[in-house]
Curated annotation (Swiss-Prot):
Disruption phenotype: Reduces growth on L-arabinose, xylitol, arabinan, Arabic gum, arabinogalactan and apple pectin, and shows poor growth on L-arabitol. The lineage of its organism: Eukaryota, Fungi, Dikarya, Ascomycota, Pezizomycotina. It comes from Aspergillus niger (strain ATCC MYA-4892 / CBS 513.88 / FGSC A1513). This is Arabinanolytic transcriptional activator araR. CDD domains: fungal_TF_MHR, GAL4. Transcriptional activator of the arabinanolytic system. Involved in the regulation of extracellular arabinanolytic genes and in the regulation of the intracellular activities of L-arabinose catabolic genes in the pentose catabolic pathway (PCP) in response to the presence of L-arabinose.
Length: 832
């Protein structure tokens, strides 16, 4: 029997909570358990002060109430059992045989056809404790079964929250205790141990056999009070009993916090760009319907960021919060693991996390039923949704920034595969048909949030050409239209695909692997909007191609960019970094062909090879010219600010502080872009592998190509000096910059290694700049390869400046460190 329930039926001989008159001034007060605790304290298993509203509910902004049935000790009387059985049998009768009329809420909802059941948010009736399914995301509306979870009694655990918080220095105005997350409690894995080469989704802590956390073992009901951000409603049943609402709100605010006041740029290091609109997520009237797994992963990403230390929580609390959100995210994603559902059901008894939820499972386990995407033998997993792809990106980004980089590829491959299954590389059809419907790419029945409905079969289908559904812009539609596929949803799909496109080229450069997402399958998709138009909601699908989406309202205005594009036009990752990654993809193809065991020997030095190299050089020159134009255009902050925000007739001149912030952002982008151009020049004609570069068995250092790369290496160091001026902590794009900094430093290391004391001061100063940048990267995103390379570079510079060392020993150690990261035919790059 749990402590809260035993408190309800407390014997009357418990000592009173009053002071005994002993005559001493320091008499210790004796407490007795309250016989009645409010619902919130009862569910969180903490002491209630019995003053309604109690102090805990007041601090947490939770409605304090007592609605559960009072229980007494002993066995239930037989007459009571008979009455309960009769009530259950009556409730299980068909609707047609009941004499009573349906409730107003039931009468308002019409009959639901098979394959298109309605879905609602979690809610719990105080009398019945019935929990309904959560609101699925935009793409999860197909064939969802209505689920009713039986109430579950949480396992008995020893609550050490009071003692734990007593040891932490938390101010009285900070967050309320994290109930049920005491030291050594709960089924949550240690966040730094689960990367240890194991499958994260299959992780199960042995300590979870005897204890279950309320947030995962059952789906407690959110309080009746209105949420500050209604978008969080699907995930609140999992968080209500473990995290205070104020903390959840602050983490969501941190996720959408911008590093600049002029443009939206993520401040969290694990967020590379915004594929979701801030205004749509934080809206109180029509929030974007999102899956619980996506919401949990967003909170996890925010909690992992260093800026979470600014929140009034202690480091031990933050660590436990990250552990909780990690376990919750992976648990909610578990149905998307590519295993048989039959095997998963058979393993329910042995899996404590699965057993805690039960065979019916939370609503997220039935978003993708087998009847739609599986086969008759249970060998094909569910399709998934756009929200699941974004969740995979969050999880994979977190693992990639850890030491277990190779383990992240399974998550990236899952994101790539699911994105291809959902056909994110294709323009979504406004009116999908049975034959041309992309599997899992669009919703097909009602949404549960106001203003976001299912698919409309309205007058947007081109009946004159039934073989090709209409792709035209639907910017005249609003969220208030029932069944509307909005332009926002179409743009989310594009931005998700292009983010994966960037990540694929980045990972291929890091891990010396071929490309997974090809240019050929991306050429029909419009490039992302600029960040200002996207965040302001000014979205149009207006392609310059005649066979692409057309916008009847815009006409020849608002023409979108198409692939391929080698122009720098925006401050966002999609604006200046996507063209460079397109060129990087061609360099990766060239390097893979050069390292091919048979193809490389036949093509190296031939005319087709030289023609390909010349084409890449042309693209780089085109980008450099656009970068100069961008710098000149961006010198006037009035133009971009008017595009980032809706113009006003009486718009005032830009404030000096805002103009300075815009100029600072522009110079940061130009510095990074200039450095990346020089690195791509080095990768085009130079060697990627540091050991082969130092050994120089083919005498490449005597070729004209080596002389041309030296100037780019020095110019790259000069660009890094500018980067350190505008972005001292390398926080603008730390995830992408590490490998670029490494490849740009290999040539300088080679020169210092060869020349030793004869190296000029310019070379040594360039090396010092690279070392300072590497040290900043280590502070921002601490990874082992950067720490190792910093030591190698520092020892080489110190040796060149005259420090006495054992040359043979130091060279052997230096080569041993560099041999860990190879870009040869069999090398795996940074993936150890």
């Amino acid at each position: 029997m749990d402590s809260a329930q035993s408190g309800d039926a407390q014997a009357p001989n418990v000592p009173a909570a009053t002071e005994e008159p002993t005559g001493e001034a320091t008499t210790k007060r004796r407490w007795r358990r309250n016989r009645i605790a409010c619902d919130s304290c009862h569910s969180r298993r903490v002491r209630c002060d019995r003053a309604f509203p109690c102090s805990r509910c007041l601090r947490s902004d939770i409605r304090c109430e007592f609605t559960r049935e009072r229980r007494k000790r002993g066995r239930i009387a037989r007459s009571r059992l008979v009455e309960t059985k009769t009530a259950v049998e009556k409730a299980s009768q068909p609707v047609e045989t009941r004499d009573s009329a349906p409730a107003p809420a039931e009468a308002g909802s019409g009959p639901v056809p098979n394959g298109s059941p309605s879905s609602t948010f979690h809610h719990r009736s105080p009398a019945t404790n019935d929990v309904t399914g959560s609101a699925p995301s935009i793409d999860e509306r197909r064939s969802q079964a209505d689920v009713s979870l039986p109430p579950r009694k949480p396992g008995h655990t020893v609550n050490a929250t009071e003692e734990w918080l007593a040891g932490t220095h938390v101010s009285p105005g900070s967050y309320e205790p994290l109930a049920g997350i005491g030291p050594g409690e709960g089924p949550f894995p240690r966040i730094f141990d689960i990367w240890n080469g194991v499958d994260l989704a299959g992780y199960s802590d042995p300590a979870s056999q005897g204890s279950k956390i309320t947030g995962l073992g059952q789906t407690p009901a959110p309080s009746a009070t209105i949420l500050k951000y209604p978008v969080l409603q699907p995930v609140m049943p999992y968080l209500e009993s473990s995290l205070p609402r104020k903390l959840v709100y602050d983490l969501l605010d941190l996720y959408f916090t911008s590093a600049f006041s002029t443009h939206m740029h993520p401040v969290c290091h694990h967020i590379h760009c915004y594929v979701l609109r801030k205004a749509s997520f934080l809206s109180r009237e029509a929030p974007r319907p999102s899956s619980p797994a996506l919401l949990a992963s967003m909170l996890w990403v925010a909690a992992l960021d260093d800026r979470a230390f600014a929140l009034p929580i202690s480091p031990p609390q933050r660590k436990k919060i990250c552990q909780f959100l990690c376990a919750l995210t992976l648990r909610l994603l578990r149905p998307l693991i590519h295993v048989s559902f039959k095997e998963q059901e058979g393993a329910a008894a042995s899996d404590p996390l699965h057993a805690a939820v039960g065979q019916d499972g939370p609503p997220t386990t039935v978003h993708h039923p087998f009847e739609v995407g599986g086969d008759d033998r249970g060998l094909v997993g569910p399709a998934g949704s756009l929200d699941d792809v974004i969740t995979y990106i969050h999880v994979a980004s977190i693992i990639s920034s850890s030491e277990q980089k190779a383990a992240s590829m399974r998550w990236w491959h899952a994101a790539f595969t699911l994105a291809r299954e959902l056909k994110l590389n294709q323009e979504i059809e406004v009116m999908p048909s049975e034959e041309n419907h992309p599997e899992g790419s669009s919703p097909s029945f009602d949404y549960s949030l106001a203003g976001w409905s299912g698919v409309d079969t309205g007058p947007f289908f081109d009946y004159s050409n039934p073989a090709r559904p209409s792709l035209n812009c639907v910017c005249d539609r609003g969220h208030e239209l029932r069944g509307a596929i909005t332009e926002e949803h179409r743009e989310e799909r594009r931005r998700t695909w292009w983010l994966l496109y960037i990540m694929d080229r980045h990972l291929a450069l890091c891990y010396n692997r071929p490309l997974a997402l090809l240019d050929a399958e991306s050429e029909d998709l419009l490039l992302p909007l600029d960040e200002g138009s996207w965040q302001s909601g000014n979205i149009h699908s207006n392609s310059p191609k005649p066979d692409g989406p057309q916008c009847p309202l815009s006409g020849e205005k608002n023409k979108r960019r198409v692939f391929p594009n080698f122009i720098c036009h925006d401050h966002s990752i999609f604006g200046f970094f996507l063209p460079l990654m397109t060129i990087t993809g061609e360099l990766i193809d060239l390097n893979q062909a050069r390292n091919h065991p048979m193809l490389g020997a036949r093509l190296n030095g031939k005319d087709p090879w030289d023609a390909h190299v010349g084409e890449v050089l042309r693209q780089l020159e085109l980008y450099k010219a656009s970068l100069t134009t961008f710098a000149a255009t961006a010198s006037d902050p009035d133009a971009p600010l008017s595009s980032a925000f809706p113009p006003k007739p009486d718009q005032q001149p830009v404030e000096p502080s805002l103009a300075q912030a815009y100029s600072w952002h522009t110079q940061t982008v130009i510095s990074y872009a200039s450095y990346l151009v020089h690195v791509l020049h080095i990768l085009l004609v130079g060697k990627w592998d540091p050991v082969s570069l130092i050994e120089d068995k083919d005498f490449w250092t005597s070729s004209p190509a080596f002389a041309s790369t030296i100037s780019h290496a020095l110019d790259a160091a000069d660009s890094v000096d500018h980067i350190l001026r505008y972005d001292p902590d390398i926080s603008f794009m730390p995830y992408f910059f590490g490998i670029q900094l490494l490849q740009g430093s290999f040539l300088l290391l080679l020169i210092v290694e060869r020349l030793q004391k004869e190296a000029g001061e310019g070379i040594l100063n360039a090396c010092e700049v690279m070392i300072r940048a590497t040290e900043s990267c280590v502070v921002t995103l601490n990874t082992e390869y950067q720490r190792n390379f910093r030591q190698v570079m520092r020892s080489a510079v110190a040796q060149a400046r005259g420090r006495p060392v054992n040359h043979s020993e130091i060279r052997h150690r230096r080569k041993a460190v560099l041999a860990l990261y190879r870009w040869t035919r069999k090398g795996t790059g940074l993936a150890l």
